[in-house]
C-alpha cells in the first residue's frame, strides 16, 4: 500500500517507486539460520517451486533489473522474489 501511495505521489516528478519482498535467502541475517542449518535449509527448499533456497544474487538481479532504463515503465509494484514459495 505504501509503495503504491508513494508511486502515485512521486510519479508527477518522474520518480518511480517499487519494492522487493524477498523470500528465504541464505545470508548472515538471523544468525545464518537458513544458510547454516541443513534442516531449515531443506525445509524451505521443499516448499519452494524452484526447490531451493534463494541467494543474495537472486535478489540483486531483480533490483538491478528495476534500476535498468528498460524498467522505466514499472511503477508502484512490490515484486515478490521467493522462488515460488507462495504458489
What are these regions (language model features)?
Residues 8-12, 25, 54, 67:
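A short hydrophobic alpha-helix cap/turn motif
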Residues 11, 16, 74-76:
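Short, small/polar-rich loop/turn modules that mediate ligand/substrate recognition or access, typified
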Residues 12, 24-47:
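A glycine/serine/threonine-rich, flexible loop-to-helix segment
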Amino acid at each position: 500500500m505504501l509503495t503504491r501511495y508513494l508511486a502515485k505521489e512521486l510519479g508527477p516528478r518522474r520518480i518511480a517507486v517499487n519494492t522487493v519482498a524477498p523470500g528465504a535467502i541464505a545470508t548472515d541475517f538471523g544468525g545464518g539460520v537458513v544458510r547454516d542449518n541443513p534442516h531449515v535449509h531443506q525445509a524451505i527448499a521443499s516448499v519452494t517451486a524452484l526447490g531451493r533456497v534463494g541467494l543474495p544474487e537472486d535478489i540483486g538481479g531483480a533490483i538491478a533489473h528495476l534500476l535498468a532504463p528498460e524498467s522505466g515503465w514499472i511503477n508502484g509494484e512490490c515484486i515478490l522474489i521467493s522462488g515460488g514459495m507462495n504458489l
